[in-house]
Structures are given as C-alpha cells and as structure tokens.
C-alpha cells in the first residue's frame, strides 16, 4: 500500500489534481454497510472515509433516525439507503445491509465512529486474501481479567467454549470488521442480527476467523444513556446475544463439559492479575 500511495502522490503532484484515495489492491469486489441512528454529526465523515476505499457498494441502514441523517444520506451520490423509521433491533441493520449487495467482501462500520480509511483497509485486505471473518483486535486495549467488565468476559468465554481462546474477547459485536461472501452464505444474512451467534456459527463451520488489525473504538465510542454504567441496556443486550449463541451451540451438539474451560489455577491467575 505504501508503494501505491507514493505513486498516487507523485501523479497528483504532477497533474495538479487531488487524489485522496487509499491505494488498496483487491482481487475481489468489496462493499461497506453502515448502521446508524441519529448520527448527523458524524455520518458524513464516515461516508467520506469509505469513499476513499475501492468499494462497489456503500449501504447505509438508518434505524429509527429522527435527526438530519436521512437528508445527509439522500444528498450522497452512489449510496444505497435502507430507511427504517421505527427502531428495529440493535444489529438488525447488519442483516438488512448484507442482503443488498453481492460484493465478495463486506465491511461493517457504525455511523457514530469516524475511522480513517487507512485503518479500515486491513480488514478488507484480510478477507480479500482468504479470511472469512476479520475482527477488530482489541486485546491489548483491555485491562487485566480481574478488572474487565461482564461484556468482555462473556465474549472471551464464548470464544473459549468454541476452542478459540486465541481470539480473547474479540467479537463481531465490535466494529469495524469484515466478512466474506462465503461466510454470509453459510451462516445466512439473518444470523448477522445476533453477532455472537454468527461468529459462533462461522467457527463451528470451520471458517477462518482472525483478528488482523486494531482500531481503538473503546475511547471513540459515543457515550449514550444506553451504554453507560454497569448493567446498562447495551451491555444487557450483548450478554443476551452471547447467551443465545451458547444456546444455539448446545442445540448443534456442543458439550460444555468437553469445552476447554479455564482450570482453577488459570482462574486464580487471571483473578489476581494486575
């Protein structure tokens, strides 16, 4: 990508034109899905960054929006809009968006987080090169186990039950992440409405799930009344989604007694970690 950027800079300098794009060479087609609700302050910036990437489609799902977000999207050329006036489920927009593009790689972002295109590119690249699920790697941003919240712990628990403890607390719950068309066809678009369940299905089907790059969405996450404080609405939703994923895993023949869970020594070590 550095060589491509140097070429573009040289061309722009010689031609006197501004080419503010990310020179990402993809073998397959790619698209992005943005889920948003009342994000008029950031949605335009999110779209601007996505338009710097080689995407065939950009799908915006406005879910229960009451601000000026709809007008902003309607003014954007080349954007597919899904407008749901009533508030649907928290992650239903992902399932809707995935049905509206035939791209080989789908990048999922939220309308309240402005992530530079350069930081989004690694997720597209990973799937283009063979990964089925490319997660945001937040491992180094989390505190020691003893100081982690209940959401981080249940994410790690699900991964460990699925024999993917190497993924830590990394989850499709967090954005950005990218998925392959193969993954979506196998787990079905509807499963994306419950991200942990979709991730569990991908792992159970032997798909390639990785966490290739890090975007710090912890500090940049927009604070709302629904995501602040212990046991907040969003935390309860995420925990419920993980319990649904565990239930689905058990229905498919999973056995908690045979899962690779923490030993007493490991639990003590993590509890006492500082």
Q: Over which residues does each language-model region extend?
A:
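Conserved donor-nucleotide/metal-binding helix-loop-beta segment in metal-dependent transferases, i.e.
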Residues: 118-142
């Amino acid at each position: 990508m550095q060589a491509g950027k140097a070429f573009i800079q040289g061309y722009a300098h010689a031609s006197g034109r501004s080419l503010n794009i990310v020179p990402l060479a993809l073998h397959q087609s790619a698209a992005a899905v943005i889920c948003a609700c009342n994000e008029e302050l950031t949605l335009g910036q999110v779209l601007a960054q996505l338009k710097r990437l080689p995407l065939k489609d950009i799908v915006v799902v406005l879910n229960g929006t009451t601000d000026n977000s709809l007008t902003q999207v309607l003014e954007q050329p080349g954007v597919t809009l899904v407008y749901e006036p009533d508030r649907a489920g928290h992650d239903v927009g992902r399932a809707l968006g995935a049905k509206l593009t035939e791209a080989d790689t789908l990048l999922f972002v939220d309308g309240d987080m402005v992530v530079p295109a350069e930081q989004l590119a690694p997720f597209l690249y990973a799937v283009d090169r063979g990964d089925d699920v490319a997660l945001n790697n937040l491992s180094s941003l989390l505190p020691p186990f003893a100081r982690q919240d209940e959401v981080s712990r249940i994410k790690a628990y699900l991964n460990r039950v699925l024999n993917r403890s190497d993924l830590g607390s990394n989850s499709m719950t967090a954005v950005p992440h990218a998925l392959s068309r193969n993954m979506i066809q196998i787990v079905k678009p509807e499963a994306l409405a419950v991200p942990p369940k979709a991730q569990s299905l991908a792992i159970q089907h032997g798909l390639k799930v990785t966490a290739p790059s890090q975007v710090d969405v912890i500090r940049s996450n927009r604070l709302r009344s629904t995501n602040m404080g212990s046991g907040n609405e969003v935390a309860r939703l995420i925990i419920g989604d993980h319990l649904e994923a565990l239930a689905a895993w058990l229905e498919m023949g999973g056995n908690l007694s045979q899962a690779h869970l923490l030993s007493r020594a490991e639990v003590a070590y993590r509890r006492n970690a500082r």
